[in-house]
Amino acid sequence: MRLILLGAPGAGKGTQAKFICEKFGIPQISTGDMLRAAVKAGTPLGVEAKKVMDAGGLVSDDIIIGLVKDRLKQDDCKSGYLFDGFPRTIPQAEAMKDAGVAIDYVLEIDVPFDAIIERMSGRRVHVASGRTYHLKYNPPKTEGVDDETGEPLIQRDDDKEETVKKRLDVYSQQTRPLVDYYSAWAANGDPAAKVAPPKYRKILGVGNVDEITARVFEALK
């Protein structure tokens, strides 16, 4: 099972990625983790990437694709792999296709933006313990304070409505076009591609976690 998970920030990709990886016995591949590991190990690509990052630059797609190809040669990828948060752009998707990286499924978790804003902006956190609440779905017994300690809850900057809206804007401009790219490739094929087109599946990411997980596994049959 080789797949790419797509969806907006806050759509619940991380939760579903964990369930998919457990069910199919495959690793979750994160470009951030790969970069850190390559830099730490001092591989040729890691050294190159470190130079760019130390200079405050963005690591090129060529380096990222090189890291991906190296990562997929490792033993734990023999049964498949799951990409979460990659590719982010059409050029990265094209580079993956040109590099012959095979994908069986592209799964989009679709959640309306207003639901994501409500889901994320309603979160409140007790910093010391990491306990998380939600104003609507899991409120504290007393407004604004942690159930166990009575200490104040905070809203993380990442969860503030204006920040969530900005992240969704970036997603719409950069990553949302991947949905059209992969659905078109799945529907029409590409004779020039080195790999077969993936199957494209879209599921609704609204409801409780068990319902969404059931939809995910049904889509991957």
Curated annotation (Swiss-Prot):
Region spans: Disordered: 138-159
Any one annotated GO CC term: cytoplasm
Disulfide bonds: none
Annotated pathway: Purine metabolism; AMP biosynthesis via salvage pathway; AMP from ADP: step 1/1
Stored InterPro entries: Adenyl_kin_sub (IPR006259), Adenylat/UMP-CMP_kin (IPR000850), Adenylat_kinase_CS (IPR033690), Adenylate_kinase_lid-dom (IPR007862), P-loop_NTPase (IPR027417)
SUPFAM superfamilies linked: P-loop containing nucleoside triphosphate hydrolases
Ranges where the record places region NMP: 30-59
Enzyme nomenclature, EC number: 2.7.4.3
UniProt keyword list: ATP-binding, Cytoplasm, Kinase, Nucleotide biosynthesis, Nucleotide-binding, Transferase
GO molecular function: adenylate kinase activity; ATP binding
Cellular localization per UniProt: Cytoplasm
Binding annotation for AMP: 31, 36, 57-59, 85-88, 92, 156, 167
Tagged with keyword Transport: no
Catalytic reaction(s) noted: AMP + ATP = 2 ADP
Keyword ATP-binding: yes
Residues involved in ATP binding: 10-15, 123, 132-133, 207
Family: Belongs to the adenylate kinase family.
PANTHER family membership: NUCLEOTIDE KINASE
Free-text note regarding domains: Consists of three domains, a large central CORE domain and two small peripheral domains, NMPbind and LID, which undergo movements during catalysis. The LID domain closes over the site of phosphoryl transfer upon ATP binding. Assembling and dissambling the active center during each catalytic cycle provides an effective means to prevent ATP hydrolysis.
Role: Catalyzes the reversible transfer of the terminal phosphate group between ATP and AMP. Plays an important role in cellular energy homeostasis and in adenine nucleotide metabolism.
Subunit-structure text: Monomer.
Protein name according to UniProt: Adenylate kinase
Provenance organism: Cupriavidus taiwanensis (strain DSM 17343 / BCRC 17206 / CCUG 44338 / CIP 107171 / LMG 19424 / R1) (Ralstonia taiwanensis (strain LMG 19424))
Upper lineage: Bacteria, Pseudomonadati, Pseudomonadota, Betaproteobacteria, Burkholderiales
Gene: adk
